[in-house]
Amino acid sequence: MHFPLPQPDVSATFKRRLNRFLGVAEVEGEEALVHIHDPGRLAELLFPGSTVWLRKKAGGKAPYYLLAVELPEELVLVDSAMHNKIATWLVEEGHVFKGYSVAKTEPSYGRGRFDLLLRRPDGGLALVEVKGVTLEVGGVALFPDAPTARGARHMEELARAAAEGYEAHVLFLVLRRRARLFSPNWALDAKFAEALAKAADAGVKISAVKLEMFKWGLKFAGELPVKLR
């Protein structure tokens, strides 16, 4: 089984990024605005001349929505709106959290909203925060690729939940084919990395899985080792 992705409408050549959510691509010989849902920098993916796959978008400033980037050796999903659906599929297929089921999406806890609330086989509940990883350097998948104060706050909330006796998880979806290991990006965002490591010390369970993209779907490619420090 694989996770089906929406069929893109057109391939294009990326030209430049305007801001966090907008870029410009050349589509069939003309420049067009593209909505970018992933807030990361994506500098190693979205550079002038890179091949991108777009979906047509109804309404809003941009007529296109960025789905994926095509590199010489791989396709990389860059639509972060898909992450919760992918994580739900992984649970339902038994690839992660075997025996658990999805009780709720986007549950609230404390001052934060998380991605999934799972029900354990014994009826208990588990909070899960899902993060997508598109940065890979020398076989190491790194998160984040841009500083994320919100991400650090999520880790602190999960640590509090674990300290109060709740089961809590962080699941990293690694979307790079060559990745062999996951690590927080200490060089770029030490605050997030430290918050993640402290969350693990508090009892939050950290895991990473690799997903390989093809036209047009994702296949589960196994768990990756995690190195926090």
UniProtKB/Swiss-Prot annotation:
One annotated GO molecular function:
DNA binding
Under the heading InterPro entries, the entry gives: SfsA, SfsA_C, SfsA_N
Q: Which cysteines are joined by disulfide bonds?
A: none
By its UniProt entry, which PANTHER family does this protein fall under?
SUGAR FERMENTATION STIMULATION PROTEIN A
Family per similarity comment: Belongs to the SfsA family.
This one is known as Sugar fermentation stimulation protein homolog
